[in-house]
Amino acid sequence: MRLAQCCNYRDFRELARRRLPGPIFNYIDGAAEDETTYRRNTLAFEDCDLVPNVLTGVAQVDLSVSVMGERLAMPFYCSPTALQRLFHYEGERAVARAVNKFGTMFGVSSLGTVSLEEIASNFSFPQVYQFYFHKDRGLNKAMMDRAKRAGVRIMMLTVDSITGGNRERDLRTGFSIPLRLTLGGMMEFAIKPRWAIEYFTHERFRLPQLEEHVDMKGGAMSIGDYFTNMLDPAMNWSDVAQMVKQWNGKFCLKGIMSVDDARKAVDIGCAGIVVSNHGGRQLDGSRSGFDQLAEIVDAVGDKIDVLVDGGVHRGSHVLKALSLGAKAVGAGRYYLFALAAAGQAGVERALHLMRLELERDMRLMGCTSVSQLSRRNLRFRSSVR
């Protein structure tokens, strides 16, 4: 299969599987424990049916939305994710160039492999800096100060990762940063020489947001170790309220799953929340973001911008979430597999296909703008939600 033959998420995933060494593919593809929540994230959309209207005159369709005061050309964005230069040597640079062409939102992670200054200075799309709450309070402040100097518009604090999820695929392969593998994991690298050539013939792998604060040269640190040893499980609402005040700008919490927490986010002055279970990579057995979306929108949707991610593979998934009241919908694996498959060209094709699906499905729904979508367009198969 070639990139031009890729028509959907499954195709990008298959191309990525062929190109990547097994441990790296499984880092993207894997989730926590039995991966129940990971599967549930996508299955939740199948429990919801779309109800279209016809004869509405849909020659022109406007996909644009406003999110936390930022204008996006379409209601789908690329969620900030870690370690992207492991998947393709251009990493965040490739994603940023693709996103810039499509006028949507993207951001650098504190576990990103390109500096937030480089992305912020070279691209004009709405940019997010996604970070974690560390035990070192000085590090937290330094990250916010750095983001402010770089011109980042939205700070996004991930709040569902105070310790690492039990990602058993990574445990089996020995996946870590720097790479430290089991014998089986090393064999997986040996049979994917193209990836190795690209990885070792380009610039050194770095975590530029952390390298001034975290010494990883002395030994390998698994992602689970990073979450467990570096992040602060004592983080509470007072800590976050102080950070919101210090930032004095648009602040978003990623990983909100309950109505109570959504209301607290409003109370401390957040501009947005992302209803998310971290792609099923943290607490296995938790609900899907889509299943939680309606009650959270009902509680706070008129006071704060509610976004959602998790299991999004299709434009129809995005429309279902928008119909429930989400302002925009994010995804990680959707574009990461495309990045791994073909770099910038892969991400551009993934975003192109998503935009085509959104435009086509909007017309088939009888809607000319996102604001026309509502719960009148939905029916749920399950009687209990």
Regions flagged by a language model, labelled:
Residues 1-46, 291-308, 312-385:
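Alpha/beta catalytic cores of nucleotide-metabolism and tRNA/nucleoside-modifying enzymes
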